[in-house]
Amino acid sequence: MENEITKLIDEVKQFTIDRDWDQFHNPKDLAIALSIEASELLEAFLWKSPEDAKTEKIKEELADVINYALLLADKCGLDVAAIVREKMIRNAKKYPVDKAKGVATKYTEL
């Protein structure tokens, strides 16, 4: 899996290098772009039931979100697999199965 993540990062980086876009990719602007793409993902669901959302639009916007997240992590020198695992460990402590299973309650209210 980690090898696949590294390959994806390399592919996305090469895409931007080939177009000389890397000069525009600083952490601030990548975070802003990620947020904008996340909003476009939300737009796929706006005024629709979840079942009516268009799968192709979701795939397109989700790919943009992931691409910017990968670029941001790389630009900040972060290991994507490691930070996801670290966050899952923190989440497991905040949301123990015996208290959080089947409920949508925030950890501060469990």
Model-identified regions with their sequence ranges:
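Flexible "arm" and connector segments at domain edges
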Residues: 1-110
